[in-house]
Amino acid sequence: MKLVFTGGGTGGHIYPALALAESFRKKGDEILYIGSNDGLERRIVPEEGFDFQGIEVAPFPRNLSVHLFSSLLKTGRGFIQARKLLRKFKPDVVIGTGGFVSGPVVLAAALQKIPTVIHEQNAYPGLANRLLAPFVTRIALNFKEADRHFKEKAREKIEITGNPIRERILTTSREEGLLNLGLRKGKKNILVFGGSQGAKNINEAMIACYRYFKNNSKLQIIHLTGMRNYQEVLQDLKEKGLDPSKYTQYKIMPYLDNMEWAYAVADLVIYRAGATGLAEITAKGIPAILIPYPYATGNHQEHNARSLEKAGAAIVIKDSELKGHKLVKLIEELINDGKRLKKMAQSSKRMGKPWARNTLINLIEDTAKGS
């Protein structure tokens, strides 16, 4: 079988596609990934060993502005490029996982009568998937409540599948993670990240944590700052006399391609609340402190976070209320309360859907066969 995957802009759209693509590659199927020339996927996808073709696309402005015409023009060129790539590759099915690049690719496939599947990770669907819904063959959702944002006719195509997780996230051992990250055994490990783009407020709050925990020999921190804020975080720490090179218990990096190592060792995660990251966290059963991104479409990140909080798997702090001293206090409370941390981990594990990848694979195969 020949499959085209498309989706990008952030890791939240890219990694679900890669989780599925990995499984189909193991079956001997032929994969092509179509992404943006300017997106994160342009680097990540080839590094994972998949054929990648870039097209021209631009996000639509949320409000009417002078940028709308240029976005339409660029996306129109991307549509023509996608159509040519599809005619040449002749896929049996096209799968879109969101982000503005998926729009022209999936639409071009649908208009060529190629079976199409879109996957929506969030409780509030992204613009691309809402616009594509009338044209596609099937719609896969992570959250059941997302279906109310689609028109009635589109709802007939919906299946609740969960969010696909890369196999190595599920199988990597703690020992392997410790070895690859250069961390010591027998300590509590905290993973801090704000998604593939980073999170400035979380980074700033962590400065207070580094100062407070610098002499705590029982704690290790893996902090992924995001590319944009990495140098700023290092400089800030050095100015406060906390040169990271002198503190081996702190692993501060702009980004980590091998997230399976970090998840494998984490006893607590501090994160935004993107759906893909939450799917990975719950599949591993890791307790979390969540700081939802306040400007996400439809405030979907807070909705995502509150669902974990309600289940007892996470504690939620609003971005506007995030302060360094507050984060320090919460970390200390959790790390020193083994029973509470264990209970949160159990709740997190119950929320996980490690089987989601297989459900989606079956849906995609059925769609390609026309059943």
Curated annotation (Swiss-Prot):
Its EC number is 2.4.1.227. GO terms for cellular component: plasma membrane. Keywords: Cell cycle, Cell division, Cell inner membrane, Cell membrane, Cell shape, Cell wall biogenesis/degradation, Glycosyltransferase, Membrane, Peptidoglycan synthesis, Transferase. UDP-N-acetyl-alpha-D-glucosamine binds at residues 10-12, 122, 166, 196, 301. Its main location: membrane. GO terms for molecular function: UDP-N-acetyl-D-glucosamine:N-acetylmuramoyl-L-alanyl-D-glutamyl-meso-2,6-diaminopimelyl-D-alanyl-D-alanine-diphosphoundecaprenol 4-beta-N-acetylglucosaminlytransferase activity; undecaprenyldiphospho-muramoylpentapeptide beta-N-acetylglucosaminyltransferase activity. Disulfide bonds: none annotated. The keyword Transferase applies. It is an enzyme of class 2 (transferase). This is UDP-N-acetylglucosamine--N-acetylmuramyl-(pentapeptide) pyrophosphoryl-undecaprenol N-acetylglucosamine transferase. It comes from Halothermothrix orenii (strain H 168 / OCM 544 / DSM 9562). The gene is murG.
